[in-house]
Amino acid sequence: LMMPAIWILAISSALMYVSRYAVNSWGVFYLETQKGYSTLDASFIISIGSVCGIIGTMFSGVISDKFFSGRRNAPALIFGLMNVMALCLFLLVPGVHFWVDALSMVLFGTAIGVLLCFLSGLMAVDIAPRNASGAALGIVGIASYIGAGIQDIMSGILIGGHKSIVDGKEIYDFSYINIFWIGAALLSVFFALLVWNVKSKD
């Protein structure tokens, strides 16, 4: 537990949880408010991410074992960047473009599903000594949910704090949310890169 790599990985996972729960908690609201979707359509689009997350989780081990000889760092980088790209599609393409937003959720869900296994699980086990693997998983797990909690608070502040009333309608400025969510995903990739060559001391 004194290994800095475990704590760095915990930060990376926490930042990934920021983007995960940002979309899960606020995605429907964002699509309705910023892009003009109906509640039904917005909910359907976000649900695509959940389904693809299951697929990403199911195949994460196969991806690393079959295509990367059991290494987790390269696929963590690839799917971390996929998460960033998905958020950019979701947040930065204005208006109602159903297939673009659906594609963003396919990419997002798949990426998050894989990253959940790698950042929040397998990489911690690979790095930690055998007699401390459970504790390492606990640290990463706690940090991840702290990240999720901070996300809800910060997103609420950023959304509520940049609301204005124009002609009797509530108008939201999501530019700060874009920076927060995409920035968290980018920083998650950065911190994951810092443990690229770290190996267990066993």
Regions found by a protein language model. Give the residues of each.
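A membrane-interface helix-boundary motif in multi-pass transporters
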Residues: R71-A74, I157-A185
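Multi-pass alpha-helical transporter architecture, strongest
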Residues: F90-P94, F174, I179-D202
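Extracytoplasmic gate region of multi-pass secondary transporters
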Residues: M2-S60, L116, S120-G121, A148-S155
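Cytoplasmic membrane-interface "Motif A"-like loop-to-helix N-cap segments
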Residues: D65-G80
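Interfacial helix-cap and linker-helix signal at transmembrane-aqueous boundaries
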Residues: L31-E32, I63-F68, M154-S164
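C-terminal ends and interior cores of transmembrane alpha-helices
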Residues: L81-G95
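Paired intracellular helix-loop junctions of major facilitator superfamily
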Residues: S69, M123-S133
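A late C-terminal transmembrane helix in Major Facilitator Superfamily
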Residues: R130-S164
